[in-house]
């Protein structure tokens, strides 16, 4: 929401990108995950989070839930949203407008930043955090893994078809 105009109008928005780090299993195909354990899934490379969100990140379900949430929050069709892997976890979202320009929300992977932003909306709290070192910054983006397409399809279907399907999706998770 920080990348949208103050009016929160979405009429000029062409696309919103939601980024995912890929979690602890980034780069592994689904067949390689047959023998991983809970501790493997809890070992996130970038974020320190609770167990539930760490597991959701490892399965990439958290981004499907964010997709469902964003559709309702911004009152936008699911087709406006794209899920993209961004291993560095620096860019958290990107809004692309009809004129071709894009604005992104960036910070180092520190949960205090989004929590503070949510709790203090529409002000910015002064919190101790490590700013981005733009002199040594490298950003990579990858397509969402094809072998996870079914779960994304289910999330999109939940938004398209019936609001209760989002509840079912979350409960099944």
Task: Please name every model-derived segment.
Residues 1-173:
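Catalytic, metal-anchored helix/loop core of enzyme active sites in primary metabolism
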